[in-house]
């Protein structure tokens, strides 16, 4: 029996959003004001605060050392407490609005982002196979140049926290037979030295992080700049979920780069439509993902060149 394609919305997701402008206690209280009744300060190495929402799911505010702290109020002493990371719980697509309201609340409380802040999106990997994970990596390799351009990824982050796909490792992974096991894929990812039990393994710092599959059970996308715009956050999450589903639904992928070309907006819009982001439901998602790219998203070439756009010859004088 032919397997039905996976709807990308039928996947769990979560995210980490880095911010500053407010301290961790304020961020935690903001969540408590939204969900009630209070924030629990559990401390520890990440100085964690925990808040449960109305569904009993736990949201966390933690420290992230990579953030450059800022505050718009000059009278406030800025320090380590202004390095803030929001960790969402495991969410269903139907809970997207809940996440968006958290993002809006943090912005209203004074939260801001800067070039040191990133957003990481996790998509549940439980429906994936070695072949589908191979497909996801190949899709990322193929599209990463235009993805980096569309998302305006900070070059400093590309060099450090969200590097491009490791081409030699991907080549080895693609050589695995169609019936390869997850252990074989893991062996190729770690190059024969299993690091799946080490949280900060160096292989995690990829735009598409497969270390997270073996450590957390999720595929992690690390290439997004942080945002406290609810629509942008939603667009980032949907893009990651759609690529994940495409990896599951495709039988195979090609090992080649997609050229950006002279009309990047059209090239990327075509990719988004192939991911299933079609119609009015995803109009704003497409808008956010395309807004940084030059070109005409509706026409591959100069639209005046198409016969349908040529002026019609006059067939006779008006009477």
Locate the predicted segments by residue:
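Active-site histidine-anchored catalytic micro-motif
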Residues: 114-116
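C-terminal accessory/tail domains of diverse enzymes
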Residues: 1-112, 126-319
């Amino acid at each position: 029996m032919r397997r039905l394609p996976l709807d990308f919305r039928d996947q769990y997701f979560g995210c980490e959003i880095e911010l500053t402008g407010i301290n961790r206690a304020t961020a935690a209280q903001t969540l408590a004001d939204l969900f009630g009744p209070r924030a629990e300060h559990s401390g520890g190495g990440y100085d964690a605060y925990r808040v449960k929402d109305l569904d009993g799911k736990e949201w966390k505010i933690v420290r992230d050392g990579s953030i450059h702290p800022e505050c718009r109020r000059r009278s406030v002493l800025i320090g380590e407490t202004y390095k803030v990371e929001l960790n969402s719980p495991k969410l269903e697509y139907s809970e997207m609005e809940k996440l968006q309201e958290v993002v809006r609340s943090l912005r209203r409380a004074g939260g801001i982002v800067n070039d040191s802040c990133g957003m990481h999106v996790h998509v549940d990997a439980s429906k994936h196979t070695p072949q589908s994970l191979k497909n996801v990596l190949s899709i990322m390799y193929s599209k990463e140049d235009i993805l980096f351009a569309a998302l305006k990824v900070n070059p400093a982050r590309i060099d450090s926290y969200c590097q491009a796909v490791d081409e030699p490792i991907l080549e080895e992974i693609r050589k695995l037979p169609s019936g390869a096991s997850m252990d074989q894929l893991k062996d190729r990812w770690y190059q024969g030295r299993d690091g799946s039990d080490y949280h900060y393994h160096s292989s995690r710092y990829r735009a598409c992080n497969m270390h997270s599959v073996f450590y957390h059970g999720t595929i992690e996308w690390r290439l997004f700049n942080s945002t406290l715009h609810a629509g942008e956050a939603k667009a980032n999450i949907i893009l990651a979920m759609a690529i994940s589903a495409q990896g599951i639904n495709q039988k195979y992928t090609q090992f080649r780069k997609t050229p950006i070309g002279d009309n990047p907006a059209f090239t990327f819009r075509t990719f988004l439509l192939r991911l299933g982001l079609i119609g009015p439901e995803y109009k704003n998602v497409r808008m956010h993902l395309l807004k940084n790219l030059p070109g005409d998203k509706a026409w591959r070439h100069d639209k005046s060149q198409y016969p349908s756009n040529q002026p019609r010859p006059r067939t006779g004088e008006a009477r």
